[in-house]
A protein has these predicted regions:
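Conserved N-terminal glycine/acidic-rich loop preference
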Residues: 1, 8, 35-57
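N-terminal beta-strand motif that seeds the catalytic metal site of vicinal oxygen chelate
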Residues: 1-18, 82-89, 135-136
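Residue-level marker for the onset of beta-strands and adjacent loop->beta junctions
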Residues: 5, 42-43, 85, 115
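Conserved active-site tyrosine of GNAT-family acetyltransferases
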Residues: 17-22, 101
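A cross-kingdom feature marking solvent-exposed beta-strand/loop segments within repeated
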Residues: 27-42, 63-79, 102-104, 109-116, ...
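Vicinal oxygen chelate
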Residues: 45-47, 54-55, 88, 95-136
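Short, solvent-exposed interaction modules
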Residues: 72-92, 97-99
């Protein structure tokens, strides 16, 4: 069974987005800014009382998956293409869930040695998902 963990929003300016969530929603930074070398983006977790509600990510280059998605959905109402990027879930049996997805024709991506994996958007009605093991 999947348990919702947090969602990730792609933004064009991480610093201004952090301030926006602090001012509008009273959230606090739960983590320091972190750089992800694989996806080439910077991120920060936001939430309340040390608990993550959402992650904000900003692409570090123009040719990343995050940047390409933002460019593809930019329009006159959303000139920077910002918006929900990923839904993160936790599960007791990530291996079983991965096998179920693949045995039913779904596509997943994972790095060697990692228990978390990503569900390709074409397999989940274009909702990019990360499934990670529950801590403990």
């Amino acid at each position: 069974m999947l348990e919702f963990k947090h969602y990730t929003i792609a933004v064009h300016n991480l610093e201004s987005a952090v301030e926006n969530y602090k001012n509008l929603f009273g959230m606090e930074s739960v983590t320091e800014t972190e750089h992800n070398d694989i996806g080439n983006f910077d991120s920060i977790s936001m939430g309340y009382d040390g608990n993550t509600v959402l992650r904000l990510i900003e692409s570090s280059a123009d040719d990343t998956a995050v940047a390409r998605l933002m460019k593809s959905r930019a329009n006159e109402f959303n000139p920077n293409g910002e918006g929900v990027y990923l839904l993160a879930f936790e599960a007791d049996d990530t291996e079983g869930i991965a096998q179920r997805i693949e045995s039913n024709g779904g596509r997943i991506t994972r790095l060697p040695g990692r228990k978390n994996f990503f569900v390709h958007p074409t397999s989940s009605n274009f909702g990019f998902m990360e499934i990670m093991p529950k801590p403990g």
